[in-house]
């Protein structure tokens, strides 16, 4: 299990790319150098400890939020295939400092989701995933029925985020939370 106090998930390994061990990674980061600048990187499968790998190179796929990267240790497609589903991590103490009202998207994971109802804040669920291939969407698991809903990550719908106290407030338009 990933310890979110020590590690920040910055990408998801989705598939091999070609036959020479290149890997396609879905970015969860605004910092492209995490996928392009050579150096040490960490990967982890949910049930394992993080593994250290040496990033040799990487480039962004045109018009996409995904990158194709090359690790020194991964020599062929079969080895790359075994990494499908792994998460690309950075140590929390290596995260660039952000301005006051900025945060990393992955910091939204596991935040409680609140809604204003009868002038009181009510917890309705929690953030369980992020979808950002085309648009940033939060995957919220509702407490009432255990269903997951996609909520666009826009100021009009999510006017307040409190990372320190681990919650966000949503003002969904009618029907957004209904399945």
From Swiss-Prot:
Keywords in alphabetical order, please.
Chaperone, Cytoplasm, Ribosome biogenesis, rRNA processing
Q: What is its main location?
A: cytoplasm
PRC barrel domain spans which residues? 100-176
GO terms for biological process? ribosomal small subunit biogenesis; rRNA processing
The record ties this protein, via InterPro entries, to: PRC_barrel-like_sf (IPR011033), PRC_RimM (IPR056792), RimM (IPR011961), RimM_N (IPR002676), RimM_N_sf (IPR036976), Transl_B-barrel_sf (IPR009000)
| Localization (cell) | Cytoplasm
Which GO CC terms are listed, alphabetically?
A: cytoplasm; ribosome
Q: Which domain of life is it from?
A: Bacteria
Q: How does it assemble?
A: Binds ribosomal protein uS19.
Q: Which family does it belong to?
A: Belongs to the RimM family.
Q: What is known of its domains?
A: The PRC barrel domain binds ribosomal protein uS19.
| Function field | An accessory protein needed during the final step in the assembly of 30S ribosomal subunit, possibly for assembly of the head region. Essential for efficient processing of 16S rRNA. May be needed both before and after RbfA during the maturation of 16S rRNA. It has affinity for free ribosomal 30S subunits but not for 70S ribosomes.
Q: What is this protein called?
A: Ribosome maturation factor RimM
What lineage, starting at the top, does this entry show?
A: Bacteria, Bacillati, Cyanobacteriota, Cyanophyceae, Synechococcales
């Amino acid at each position: 299990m990933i310890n979110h106090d020590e590690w920040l998930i910055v990408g998801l390994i989705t598939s091999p790319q070609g036959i020479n061990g290149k890997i396609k990674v879905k970015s969860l980061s605004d910092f492209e150098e995490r996928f392009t600048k050579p150096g040490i990187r960490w990967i982890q499968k949910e049930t394992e400890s993080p593994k250290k790998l040496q990033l040799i190179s990487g480039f962004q796929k045109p018009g996409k939020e995904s990158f194709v990267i090359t690790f020194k240790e991964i020599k062929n497609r079969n080895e790359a295939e075994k990494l499908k589903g792994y998460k690309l991590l950075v140590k929390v103490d290596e995260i660039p400092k952000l301005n006051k009202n900025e945060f990393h998207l992955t910091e939204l994971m596991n935040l409680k989701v609140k809604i204003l109802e009868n002038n009181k804040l009510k917890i309705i669920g929690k953030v369980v995933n992020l979808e950002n291939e085309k648009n940033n969407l939060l995957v919220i698991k509702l407490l009432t029925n255990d269903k997951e809903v996609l909520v666009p990550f826009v100021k009009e719908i999510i006017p307040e985020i409190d990372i320190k106290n681990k919650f966000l407030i949503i003002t969904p338009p009618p029907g957004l939370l209904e399945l």
